[in-house]
Regions:
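N-terminal small-domain helix-loop-helix segment of the aminotransferase-like
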Residues: 2-109, 116, 290-292, 393
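A short helix->loop->beta-strand "cap" motif at the edges of active sites that frequently abuts
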Residues: 126, 147, 205-209, 233-235
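PLP-dependent enzyme catalytic core of the Aspartate aminotransferase-like
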Residues: 2, 150, 168, 348-358, ...
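Conserved core segment of the aminotransferase class I/II
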Residues: 4, 232-305, 309-315, 392-393
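Conserved PLP-anchoring active-site segment centered on the Schiff-base-forming lysine
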Residues: 120-142
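Helix C-cap/helix->beta junction micro-motif
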Residues: 37, 145, 205-206, 318, ...
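Conserved glycine-rich beta-strand-loop-beta hairpin in the small C-terminal domain of fold type I
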Residues: 287, 303-312, 322-334, 367
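Active-site phosphate-binding strand-loop segment of PLP-dependent enzymes
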Residues: 150, 154-225
Length: 393
């Protein structure tokens, strides 16, 4: 039989041209290769909590994993125990009343919620407002789904808060969603009741849905607050929360969103066509984790405070300045004027000191003169990173 000469060739979808591989996906491959070569890189890059969940959380998981009836498909809406757990948690810590049956949707991590919400609310060609600097996934997923991304500035001189005067002057006729993230990543800026009140007022007047991503409010933060605490916020806002950060469960992939019943149903319509319910034992364990007392959170924060001090010493050694009032699991610092380029600095630290620090440009142009240090690293490793950096020429 004659051989076919035609080469088999498949082209990727055109939508992939609008995005590149996630920065950390690429960079962590490089770090892994360096480690394979014996270079022992200390990673201060991603925010993946290294402390364990509570003991009772793990016990609940293990005990329920033995249940022979717990291994089947679970409800798309999440099991009642988890929905009630989230509702009680919001009432206790945020003072927000949520109907567990209609106003809460558990998620396989809040990151997937970005996809679900965008699919539920935004048509191709419509616009979304995304913070600069901000979480890169807000931008990349919006582009993949055909939305037009309009960035709004968060600036150091404004305390990394939205400039409402500038927003009022924008043409917002095609804007469907506005992404916000407080306590803020990467800047560590904290929310205030006044900020949330202004956002709710802005959403109502401009007919925009505010989506507030709120995973960091229990870390180095004395008073967690929710945008849903503003009267009427449920009518125009959606809030994400995540157990990855607050309960040291990043690998479990358990998060949630809360809003009004109609919005939640729209999102469920998308979600139920994309995935299924999480393993029952995990959901029961997550519900147990949500019952943690204040001293459990304080135990985490005691560790984070010590780590933040060491991260601050690293910042000072690099000549960076930072706001000591930051909250969350990162430290955000401004590079010195003598430094021409942030990536030049972080690459020098990576290849000469073997310490991986995140350059701020990956979060947007307003992060181009900043670096971010993760606090998700044991004290001894942070101290070693500091000593390595001190030896840089």
């Amino acid at each position: 039989m004659q051989k076919e000469s035609q080469t088999y060739k498949i082209a990727p979808a055109e939508r992939l041209a609008s995005v590149s591989e996630y920065y950390f996906s690429k960079k962590l491959k490089e770090v892994a290769q360096m480690n394979a070569e014996g270079k022992d890189v200390i990673s201060l890059g991603i925010g993946s909590p290294d402390m364990p969940p509570s003991k009772v959380t793990i016990e609940t998981l293990c005990n329920n994993a033995h249940d022979p009836n717990g291994h089947g498909y679970q409800p798309y809406v999440g099991i009642p125990e988890l929905r009630k757990g989230f509702a009680a948690w919001y009432q206790r810590w945020y003072g927000v009343e949520l109907n567990p049956n209609t106003e809460i949707q558990p998620l396989i991590g809040s990151k997937e919620g970005i996809l679900h919400v965008t699919l539920a609310f935004v048509n191709p060609g419509e616009q979304v407002l995304v913070p600069n600097p901000g979480y890169p996934t807000y931008t990349s997923l919006s582009k993949i789904l055909g939305a037009e991304v309009i960035s709004y500035d968060l600036k150091e001189e404004d305390g990394w808060m939205p400039d409402f005067e500038a927003l009022e002057k924008m043409d917002l006729n095609r804007v469907k969603l506005m992404w916000t993230n407080y306590p803020n990543m990467p800047t560590g800026a904290n929310a205030t009741p006044e900020l949330y009140e202004r956002l709710v007022d802005f959403a109502r007047r401009k007919n925009i849905v505010i989506v507030n991503d709120n995973p960091y409010s229990f870390i180095l933060n004395e008073k967690p607050i929710s945008i849903l605490s503003v009267p009427g916020a449920k009518e125009c806002c959606i809030e994400f929360n995540s157990m990855s950060k607050s309960h040291n469960m990043p690998g479990w992939r358990i998060g949630m969103l809360a809003s009004n019943a109609e919005f939640v149903q729209w999102i469920l319509k998308v979600k139920s066509n994309l995935d299924s319910g999480m393993f029952r034992a995990m959901q029961l364990a997550a519900a147990t984790a949500l019952e943690a007392e204040a001293d459990w959170y304080e135990g985490n924060n005691h560790n984070y405070r010590g780590r933040r001090h060491l991260a601050g010493e690293i910042m000072k050694t690099l000549g960076c300045t930072y706001d000591e009032n930051q909250v969350g699991m990162f430290l955000w610092g401004k590079i010195p004027a003598s430094c021409k380029d942030v990536e030049e600095l972080t690459e020098k630290v990576l290849h000469q000191a073997r310490v991986f620090i995140t350059p701020g440009f990956i979060f947007g142009s307003n992060g181009a003169r900043f670096i971010r240090i993760s606090l998700c690293c044991k004290d001894a490793k942070l101290a070693e990173a500091l000593e390595r950096i001190k030896k840089l020429s």
